[in-house]
Amino acid sequence: MEGNTTFYATPTLNTVQNWRAATHDDFRFTFKLPKAITHEQMLRGCSEQLRDFMKVMEPLHDRVGQWTIQLPAAFGPEHLDRLKNFCASFPPNFPLGVEVRHMAFFSKGEEERALNQWLVENNIDRIIMDSRPVFAAKPNNEAIIDAQMKKPRVPVHAIATASHPLIRFIGHPEEQQNYEFFTP
């Protein structure tokens, strides 16, 4: 279950405790790190914010399958060292996933190879974004128009860089239309 709300605001401790109470021990969440860290500060000078966020989320740490570092399109290859330093602040084998949006990381060139190699070496998942279905939908209502304006249109690069690959599938509003995107 993706916890997208953490991207927009850090929940209260009470909310986190309610999420814990509402789930079984074998349930796994995927939480996004706050956009204040990933987008606004672009992983710079955010150690205190990260510490505060992780402290609030602590009651759920054993129920997190992956922590998502969703990066903005402006976060490119020139920032890779910053990503490396940021991820090094987590304990080894902490369940991290990185979602990139800069087109250089989809070019099959040296920048993408460097990213993927580093992710493999550090057991960090590269999150696969598949937004094709939402862009295949006719923009005939507000929700679709909004999604098409906000969601990234990046190539689908099916790659597993660690042991828990994750696909963010942004589906077509008509369920039947999604099936063609599941076929290789």
Annotate each PLM feature:
Residues 1-184:
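Residues lining hydrophobic/aromatic ligand-binding pockets adjacent to catalytic sites
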